[in-house]
Amino acid sequence: MSDATPFRPPSEAEEALIKETRLPLTGWQQEVDQGLTYGLEAAASIKDRSIPTFSRGELPHYAGINTFMKAPYLEDVREVGKYDVAIVGVPHDSGTTYRPGTRFGPQGIRRISALYTPYNFEMGVDLREQISLCDVGDIFTIPANNEKSFDQISKGIAHIFSSGAFPIILGGDHSIGFPTVRGICRHLGDKKVGIIHFDRHVDTQETDLDERMHTCPWFHATNMANAPAKNLVQLGIGGWQVPRQGVKVCRERATNILTVTDITEMSLDAAADFAIARATDGTDCVWISFDIDCIDAGFVPGTGWPEPGGLLPREALYLLKRIIRETNVCGMEVVEVSPPYDISDMTSLMATRVICDTMAHLVVSGQLPRTEKPAYIHAEANMAVDEPWQ
């Protein structure tokens, strides 16, 4: 046995062990110190003196207030520009056409996000040490009134975006895709945004059930000059839930669609290259709209329109990695998480993974933390970026 070649872990694991040594512990120590100050020192019988009497901070994972990853709750949203990333919930499911429950998506995602630490092993990223993150709570949506809710959503997202904080939206059904992009476009001036849309459904109908529902966001978003249809990339489309009315719009507007078969046959890297090239052609930034049902239904049962045959989690996460690291990302939303239909929080956990990976890739690619507002953010709001809706 002494002559045997010593075991060496694969290169990624070996690199991960080294990366961890380069990370500071400043944020962790600040959290401990604050916890002991605000939460009182522990009882005398507790040997680990970093533990307070009242839970403050990451540990224990089953306790505490459910903000996203236990990030600070920002009561005064006027101060959001002081943070690198702002998490905002949009508890709206009045746009659903089948199974409701996505109004509870933000709660479900926040609750299971407590399971995560801020550190990712493979990437060697510690979000607590490398960015400032806050949770601004939820936008006040209006039940049973999509248009009033859309107005609220656009105003809220425009506020966060214009502040310079990176907005991450917890949906909510996919009808919110239109007002979130509208909020972004209000502060783009003459700049343009490409949209990369992960989904099993095209979501390009003009109306559904006589309203702008979760099947309709991209028809209306791509009506705006700041969000051209030629820069809309749709990844994972397919199956038995793609209305022909929406297909007609995709054909007429020449959106860029890849099915799951396209992606697997051309390779993940080729699919990522395609998405990046089309979304960035003549645009200044990229918006990512991640519908959780793009993942195969066996992995994400807690959604409004589950469809078998979707992407595997590792496939979607790899595409996300390539796209975020190689484009100028201005924000993202994760939609269609419906906790009432979930099993063991697995859908909410998948959404959490998408969000945490996104933040880590932004750090690795140098997009976060920000030292100044991106040049594509225009200070003055253009409230007329979209056509009036009657």
UniProtKB/Swiss-Prot annotation:
Keywords: Cytoplasm, Hydrolase, Metal-binding, Nickel. Its EC number is 3.5.3.-. The keyword Glycoprotein does not apply. Ni(2+) 2 binds at D199, H201, D291, D293. GO terms for biological process: putrescine biosynthetic process from arginine, via agmatine. It catalyses: guanidine + H2O = urea + NH4(+). GO terms for cellular component: cytoplasm. Binds 2 nickel ions per subunit. It is found in: Cytoplasm. SUPFAM superfamilies: Arginase/deacetylase. PANTHER family: ARGINASE/AGMATINASE, GUANIDINO ACID HYDROLASE, MITOCHONDRIAL. This is Guanidine hydrolase. The lineage of its organism: Bacteria, Bacillati, Cyanobacteriota, Cyanophyceae, Synechococcales.
